[in-house]
């Protein structure tokens, strides 16, 4: 109501914008996980514009994907719920959503999730230890699969053998 808006403004609160979810189930065929169902009624309507006018991740990501003609998105399984929400955003823009694939997250040698606190396993940390980029890419191409580790010389070689159906569901150890 107008009274509520004025009250909030007088308290110094500024408005933010949310994307209204449908409350329906968002169903999609994931390239790695198979059929995925995200129940948007169990999610809060995502904030898309902060009080300061800055945008949050989901909506700009969707718009960028539309503008760039992105057809496939492969990302960590921690983004499955985001994908269900983003599918609704694509639909609201009158666009088809890309094809999604969500891979298990990598863990360290102890089975713990990677963290920013472990700088030794960061790209910079590996570079500082003189690891060759293609050696890292070669290893990464086989983690979480039954594929033997090979020494590849180009990303094209890796993309030629990459088969998402061979990815396991358990976290890969690095």
Model-predicted regions and their roles:
Residues 81, 93-174:
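Catalytic adenosine-cofactor/nucleotide-binding cores of aminoacyl-tRNA synthetases and other
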Residues 1-80, 86-87, 93-99:
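NTP-dependent nucleotidyl-transfer catalytic core
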């Amino acid at each position: 109501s107008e009274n509520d808006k004025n009250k909030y403004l007088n308290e110094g609160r500024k408005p933010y914008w949310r994307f209204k979810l449908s409350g329906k189930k968002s169903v999609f065929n994931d390239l790695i996980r198979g059929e995925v169902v995200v129940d948007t009624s169990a999610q809060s309507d995502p904030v898309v514009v902060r009080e300061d006018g800055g945008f949050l991740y989901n909506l700009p990501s969707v718009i960028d994907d539309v503008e760039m003609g992105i057809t496939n998105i492969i990302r960590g399984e921690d983004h499955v719920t985001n994908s269900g929400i983003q599918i609704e955003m694509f639909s609201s823009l009158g666009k088809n959503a890309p094809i999604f694939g969500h891979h298990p997250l990598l863990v360290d040698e102890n089975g713990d999730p990677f963290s920013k606190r472990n700088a030794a396993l960061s790209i910079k940390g590996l570079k500082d230890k003189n690891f060759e980029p293609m050696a890292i890419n070669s290893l990464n191409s086989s983690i979480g699969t039954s594929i033997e580790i090979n020494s590849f010389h180009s990303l094209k070689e890796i993309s030629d053998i990459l088969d998402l159906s061979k990815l396991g569901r358990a976290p890969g150890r690095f």
